[in-house]
Amino acid sequence: MCVSRLVLLFGLLLCVGAQLSNAQHWSHGWYPGGKRELDSFGTSEISEEIKLCEAGECSYLRPQRRNVLRNIILDALARELQKRK
């Protein structure tokens, strides 16, 4: 009886785990069945952020800890002021 409950629990956990996991992974430009988008070979798409990083203006790579802390404090103060009104 204990073994059958254990097998049932294991099977249930396996089914739930398979549903919750992201087992299917598709790379960029690939579709299900191994088909690839043909237009992606001819054009090279470089985003504006990458162009800015090459120019040395990469703001998202710099540490923003001071700004984050300042924004948290300002948001907290704004909430307090709204509560008082």
UniProtKB/Swiss-Prot annotation:
GO annotations of cellular component type: extracellular space
The answer, when asked if Phosphoprotein is one of the entry's keywords, is no
In the record, Pyrrolidone carboxylic acid modifications are located at 24
Q: Which residues carry this modification: Glycine amide?
A: 33
For this UniProt entry, the molecular function terms from Gene Ontology, in alphabetical order, are: gonadotropin hormone-releasing hormone activity; gonadotropin-releasing hormone receptor binding
Superkingdom: Eukaryota
Signal peptide positions (record): 1-23
Which terms are listed as keywords in the entry? Amidation, Cleavage on pair of basic residues, Hormone, Pyrrolidone carboxylic acid, Secreted, Signal
List, alphabetically, the InterPro entries matched.
GnRH, Gonadoliberin
Q: Where, subcellularly, is it found? A: Secreted
* Covalent S-S links between cysteines: none
Functional description taken from the UniProt entry:
Stimulates the secretion of gonadotropins.
By sequence similarity, the record places it as follows: Belongs to the GnRH family.
What is the official name of this protein in its record?
Progonadoliberin-2
Task: Give the species this sequence originates from.
Answer: Morone saxatilis (Striped bass)
- Taxonomic lineage of this organism? Eukaryota, Metazoa, Chordata, Craniata, Vertebrata
